[in-house]
Every structure is written in C-alpha cells, then in structure tokens.
Swiss-Prot record:
A single GO BP: sporulation resulting in formation of a cellular spore
Molecular function GO terms recorded: signaling receptor binding; toxin activity
PANTHER family cross-referenced by the UniProt entry: ENDOTOXIN_N DOMAIN-CONTAINING PROTEIN-RELATED, PESTICIDAL CRYSTAL PROTEIN N-TERMINAL DOMAIN-CONTAINING PROTEIN
Record keywords: Sporulation, Toxin, Virulence
Zinc-finger among keywords: no
Database matches in SUPFAM superfamilies: delta-Endotoxin (insectocide), middle domain, delta-Endotoxin (insectocide), N-terminal domain, Galactose-binding domain-like
Biased composition regions of type Polar residues, renumbered to the chain: 14-25
Organism of origin: Bacillus thuringiensis subsp. kurstaki
Protein known as: Pesticidal crystal protein Cry3Ca
Known role: Promotes colloidosmotic lysis by binding to the midgut epithelial cells of Coleoptera.
Amino acid sequence: MNPNNRSEHDTIKATENNEVSNNHAQYPLADTPTLEELNYKEFLRRTTDNNVEALDSSTTKDAIQKGISIIGDLLGVVGFPYGGALVSFYTNLLNTIWPGEDPLKAFMQQVEALIDQKIADYAKDKATAELQGLKNVFKDYVSALDSWDKTPLTLRDGRSQGRIRELFSQAESHFRRSMPSFAVSGYEVLFLPTYAQAANTHLLLLKDAQIYGTDWGYSTDDLNEFHTKQKDLTIEYTNHCAKWYKAGLDKLRGSTYEEWVKFNRYRREMTLTVLDLITLFPLYDVRTYTKGVKTELTRDVLTDPIVAVNNMNGYGTTFSNIENYIRKPHLFDYLHAIQFHSRLQPGYFGTDSFNYWSGNYVSTRSSIGSDEIIRSPFYGNKSTLDVQNLEFNGEKVFRAVANGNLAVWPVGTGGTKIHSGVTKVQFSQYNDRKDEVRTQTYDSKRNVGGIVFDSIDQLPPITTDESLEKAYSHQLNYVRCFLLQGGRGIIPVFTWTHKSVDFYNTLDSEKITQIPFVKAFILVNSTSVVAGPGFTGGDIIKCTNGSGLTLYVTPAPDLTYSKTYKIRIRYASTSQVRFGIDLGSYTHSISYFDKTMDKGNTLTYNSFNLSSVSRPIEISGGNKIGVSVGGIGSGDEVYIDKIEFIPMD
C-alpha cells in the first residue's frame, strides 16, 4: 500500500547537512554580461527602475482576468441552467470577451508576448473580422432568448418560434464556418485562447437546442442531429486545444533560467485561458448532465520565481534544475504549515546587509480522510537565525505579497556580484466556514526592502465587484526554494490551485457532484498518480490489475437524513475492466466497463468513457468509498479521472 504517493519527495538530493545539493554548473562571480560594465550606483539605479518583468503588461493581465472570470462564471451554471440564469451568464460573457470593437484582442496579444512571435496581419485581420461577426450574431441571439424567456407561454406563437429558430441557426452556422479562421496553419498556438473561447461559445449555443429546442418547434430528429454535432465538436475542439497547447509548451523548452520563466508563464497562462475552459466542455451535454453540476479544478499553477532583480542573466539557476524538481503528479493535498529558515546576507557597506528567506519545509494534509501531516524534504539552506513557523490548518491562503532586497559587491574592474533575497512575505488567508480573514507574516526583520511580488498580479480575482477574500481565484498549496548560481541567494516558487477545490469532498443534495480521484487519501498496490492529458482539470490515476484507492466524502450539510446517489466513473481502459465499489469494509457493487482505447495510444478526449456502476449508494454521515480495479491482463492500463454522485429524487 502506498498511502500518499508523494513521489516527488523521494527525488530531492540532499547534502550531508540536509541542504539541497547545488549540482549545477557554477558561473564565475563577475560573469554577468549585462552588468559588468556598470558601476555600483548605476547598477542600483537600473535594478530599481527595471523591477517589473517585461511580460507583465496590462494586455496580458487583461487576458488572464477575462479567462479567470469566465471560468468562475461557468462553474456557477454548468449542467442544466434555465431562463434568467442562462441569459444573465451570456450577457456577462459578452461583456467579458466582446466588450468593444476589437473582440478577443487581449488573448491574441497575450500569446504573442508569451512565445515572442507575431500573428501575420492577414491572419489576424481575418480572425478579427470573423470574431466581430460572431459577436454580432451571438448578441442578436441572446437578445432574442431574453425576449423569449420573458414572454408568457400563452403569448408565444409560431412567429416568435420562427424568429428565435432563425437567429439560433444563423449564430450556430456562423460559428461553424468561422472556427477554421482560428486554426490557421502555422498560427495554431498563437490563436489558441481565441479558438478556445470561440469553441466554448459555440458549444454553449448548441447546448441551448437541447434545453429549448422542443419549445422552439424543432423536431426530435433535428434535436438529435444538434446533439450529435455537439458531441462531435466537443471531441474536435478539446483535442485541438490539448494538442496545440502541448506543441507550444514543448517548443519553449530550453536550458536557461530565463527560458524556464517563459515556459512556466506559458503553462500557467494557457491553463487559465485554455485548459481550464476545455475541462468544462463535457458538462454542456444536458442529456448526460440533467442537473446542475458541482465540479472542481485540482491542477497546479506556478507563479513566477520571486526575485528582487529583473535581469538574472548569468546567475539564475538552470531550466532543468527547476523543472526537474517542481512537484510531480501527486494526490491532492492542502497547505498545513511552512517552516521558514533565514540567513544574513552581508552588504558591501554593512548598513545594506539584510536577512533573507534561505530555505523551508512544507507540511501538507490530504483533502479529507486522513489526519496524517506530510512533511516535505528541506528546500534551500538551513537557518543560521531563528526559525519561523506559520500554520494555516486548511485556511485558504488567497494572496501572498513579498518584499525583497539586493546586495551588490564590486568585483574586479567594473564587475558586480549580486545577491538577491526575499525578506518578508505577508500571507492573506480566509476561513470560509467561519467567514474570517487574517494575515500571517514571515519577516526577516532586517532591511526588508520594497515589494517585489504580489500574487494577485499573476492570479487576479474572479471579479472586482466583491472583496478579495470572496472573489479570489486561487489558493496557495505548496512552496519550495531553488538556489541561485554561485551561492547568490534563493528564489522561492509558489504553487497554487483553483478556488473551486472542496477540501471536504462535500456532496451536493441537488446537483451532480464530481470528485476527481486525485482527492483520494489512500492508493493501493500499483496505483499511481500521472499527469492529466490537459482536459481533465488536473492529474489522474493510473491503475493496473489489483490496484485501487480510497476516498472520503462528506454528506450535504443541508441533509439530516441519508441520501441515495447514482454513481458514474469517467475512465479510459485498454481492455474490459471490473470496477468494485466498497462502502467501509464491505463490497457494495461490482460493475464491468468496456474497453475504450488500444494499448500504446495517447490519451485523447475520446479515450475516456463515462459509465454507471450497477447499484446506487446511500450516503449517511461521512463515508469511506473504495474503488478497486481488476479483470485486466498483464500490460493493460486503466486511467480513472472522476467519480460522479448523482442525487436521486
């Protein structure tokens, strides 16, 4: 049994004094090409004036804000929304992605900045024209839908039916014809957020045919045709986005620190504007999701390394030294505590010396089901000053603001040796069960310098209409440090997960509840966590014969009695597979699911199937639910993504 599958904790190499080994190449102290000709005062002026990274433009932030806002709104309406809620969502969608005369411009400019490539004028002009047309037809459709919903049933007639059918058909066909303009050969990656947003709107539109089609006068054959089209396009759009996201990411792999920063920014920003969105596409199928859906995104995103200087050329760590040691796929956990270690960094003049964050331990806990606290290996260099402990105990850290400082030593003739350090971090945290906000601070207490990092700049809130503790989009769940070249300091990197994650795996009494299997707290035998294929909202579980897992679910808080749920599992398998469902210590049901893919195939959207187990489950109080996998041959593989609980009326 492997209770935690925290394999990344086994890959960190430590020195005899328990410090992370610095086994990358050492750069000469004065070998900083962009700085060595500067005198000390000129360097200080340059670093003060140039302390904001070039890619943090207002356009990029605008695109990220739009992407996060759309996901936040969608999470509130996925499933089977009716009437006013749907029209209100569409109105917000129009105001978010199509507010002016240049629709989705921010998304195009975002990727141009990320991969340092421009979209050719002919392709951009055609895409922009198509987007303007889509905006117009969708706006007309939403206006007609609003009028339809507000018209009493007794006043709806054949003319009003014909009018809304006409506008729906115009909008749907316009989207279908326009999509190739956002997949122009050679520009697939550059157009990817634009493609994803257009695809999302098209699939939402097709969903409406299933909700309203009968009232609009469509025949059963028409509705079946629309539904088939929706399912086929969900596959096409999802696979396109996952494929070209990966192609763009692979192209950005490099060897230097600066290349890793760009690589990670692409990964983070494309997750926020593309991958999070396509994760929700299956939920638009209202024949499958006949109720509202409570779902969550368990994927990790990393904010930029925290440094006190913009230009790290020559003394940043290497691409591989960061990428090889960030967290590998893991069971979901939440932040319990951080132990901060500090050291003194002498300054050239003495008075410019400062204390800095030199290393840390991280303690985490599984989402629910186990009281075990898992302590990480030590990251960085052990403290020569007092250790500081901050405990969060599951409260959601929604913002981190860091201060930093620099020590610059002249070397040789005109050269410089730069030391960078994080000197103070203020963590804002929210207890959603008590509706309480508080802050905790790591403080090195000596020359803390100015603010060099605010997580909100890279992970903005869902909306600016509410206070930040209610509107935040992400919560901190891991921290680790990396050594700069030549012992020049430490760069911390924060890992965040989406606000939608429910630590308690709480079932909804009215909605369908999706729980990713990475929310389990026990893995059995050869069960392992592997990276998701890009459209699952996080990592997934890989099983072989005889493997399994256990997760804990919490009953709906509004229930004082038991509730019965149908169970579905989203899975991919290279052979027929037997799923066993256990409640506590007894076997509740055995189900056999079909093969979905061939051995050796890459996981795509159509590799997965959603199948129901043979018996419903009655939930009363907290329940441990075991899932076992069997009946497959040697070399066969089973991947499980989510379990769904569908309340029975």
